Amino acid sequence: MDPFTLEPIGALSGHDDRVWNVAWSPQGDMLASCSGDKTVRIWSRRQPRPSEQWYCSAILDQCHTRTIRSVAWSPTGRALATASFDATVAVWELSSGVWEQVAELEGHENEVKCVAWNPDGRLIATCGRDRSVWIWESMPGREFECVDVKQGHSQDVKAVTWHPSGELLVSAGYDDTIKLWTYDGDEWGCAQTLGGTGTGHESTVWDVCWDPVSRARLASCSDDLTLRLWESRAAPTSTPASAPAGAAAAGFVPSRPDLRCAVTLSGHHRRTVFSLDWAPTGLIATGDGDDSILAEEEASGLLTQPGGQWGCWARVAKAHGADVNCVRWNPAEPRLLASCSDDGLIRLWWLR
């Protein structure tokens, strides 16, 4: 019997096609979803309790002409960025209770696969099928200017995410690699590539995320059915769980990354792992092509050890009726999980 249970507490319907991505607002009081139906839906809850009913408070449409693949909140929670297969990114702002499109970012040659806002809200990163990573800077007058384009990947780029410091950008893609980008005062350059024959994932890397507590470990998931945990080569052999946030980052400098694969988690998934998210509780949730959701954690709650033993602590078989495309923990209530799927539904789960 699993030590924890993911209890279903809600199913949100309304999209007319597969739901690709979900994202919680920084305050955790709203959830954005995007779909093949070319819309974004904003979900709000009537009462501040996880089991209360969530409802669709806004529909953002008439912007993109093809599938919306990714959605990201600004750090303030007052703006959204949406990335589409129509090769554009839209920026929306909430004003007097109404969402308004205020900018459109054009430049990618074809499908944009992911969008991510940096921690101070000044930069937006995007990536796409054209093998590129773009970095955009917010300018006065609700304008955005492309300040750099990186062509380091040899194939489709699936995901981008920022380190919490904002000093490091991570991209991952169809070429089986993860690239770490840093800024030298003039441009962004590739500081490290994770992967390659025998040193990383053996197939497409679909998603990446940082450990929100130590901020020094990176997790990735792949078409090769595994998760990999990357940490600094200079990391200590163990860090007490009672240590202050960031203590485990000893030896890790975001502007000078030097990561290695410390743990490979295998045997838990039978099909592609499309998404993962690391909660402050230490649990990593995953969503896969077997329609399942898993929550994995290190077996020891006292030590964070490189190469430590990890286990599957909760599993929901057939959590959806089709591929689970995205899983995200709520930032304000770390036991509340959202998932979305090719079945067109968003589901909410409570970890017990």
UniProtKB/Swiss-Prot annotation:
WD repeats lie at residues 14-53, 63-102, 107-146, 152-191, 200-240, 268-306, 319-352. Belongs to the WD repeat CIA1 family. The lineage of its organism: Eukaryota, Viridiplantae, Chlorophyta, core chlorophytes, Chlorophyceae. HAMAP family: ciao1. SMART domains: WD40. Keywords: Repeat, WD repeat. Essential component of the cytosolic iron-sulfur (Fe/S) protein assembly machinery. Required for the maturation of extramitochondrial Fe/S proteins. Disulfide bonds: none annotated. The keyword Repeat applies. GO terms for cellular component: cytosolic [4Fe-4S] assembly targeting complex. One of its GO terms (biological process) is iron-sulfur cluster assembly. InterPro entries: CIAO1/Cia1, G-protein_beta_WD-40_rep, WD40/YVTN_repeat-like_dom_sf, WD40_repeat_CS, WD40_repeat_dom_sf, WD40_rpt. This is Probable cytosolic iron-sulfur protein assembly protein CIAO1 homolog. It comes from the Eukaryota.
